[in-house]
Each structure stands twice: as structure tokens, then as C-alpha cells.
Amino acid sequence: MIKTTKMLAAILVCSTTPVLADGHSQIWSMAGLANAPSSSKMMEGMTGSILINSSIDLWDWSEAPEGFPTLVTAECNQSIALTAEGAPFGGVGVCSMMDPDGDLAIYFGEITPQLEYIGSLTAGSGKYEPYVGQKFVGTVTGMLKTGQQMYHVVAAD
């Protein structure tokens, strides 16, 4: 159970991209596949641990508007704080991606004790630049024993 909880928290990083709809900035829903971590490190202390993971995630942007790619990959890195018993109680994650047009986006977020990922677009170029600061919430919808997961992301506002 502790291993599953650690993996769930560690791979929860997810993202989405903002768009214009009806004159207002909005974020479309997306699905993501977090691969098993390509690297993993545990820093163990007296009262808890920090799990540091990296993975390459696949993002399904099939609901994206015209001009945005419908499928992208992102490099994601997470640091998850765990109690001495192995339960997550917070963390951070960063996902960086460059789309086929060469536009880039960096997403940052906090991983909550409820295993949600609350984040925003922190930096972006090209079509992403006008939407820096857009917020989203991600939740895991399924996980395999290998650490691979499906997650879903929606607008936070």
C-alpha cells in the first residue's frame, strides 16, 4: 500500500493548456499517461522522506482548438514529502514540453495530501505565452502496478 501511495503521489504531475472561448481564457480538459519513472530517488530522514521522480508523460489534447497539437509529450519531475509511515503530505512538480511548432510551456504545481495536483502554466512561448498563470487541477483516474497512470485535468476556475 505504501509503495502504491508513493507512486500515485509521485506521478500525479499533469497539465493542460489554455485557450480562448467566448472571449474568455479557458482551459480544455485533457487526459495524460504517466509512464513508470525513468529515475527515482528517496531521501530518507528521521521523521519522513522525500521521493524524487522523473518521467516522460504523454498528453492527449484531442479537445484542443485548431492550431494546438492533439498529442504531446512532457518531461515531468516531482518531489513528494512522505510521513514516516509513507503517506504523502505535500509536494511539487514541474512538467516541461515543446510542441511540434517549437513553442514551449512549463507547468508548475503543488501535490496535495488528497493526491490532487493544483497548478498553473508558469512560462510559455508562442501560442502559450498569453496564457501564463492559467490554473488547473489534475486527478489520477487509474494506475498499474508498474507505476504507469492515467490522469485527467480540468480548469481550476
What is each of the regions a protein language model found here?
Residues 2-10:
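Sec-dependent signal peptide recognition
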Residues 16-18:
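N-terminal signal peptide c-region/cleavage motif recognized by signal peptidases
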Residues 22-157:
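Beta-strand-enriched cores of mature, soluble protein domains
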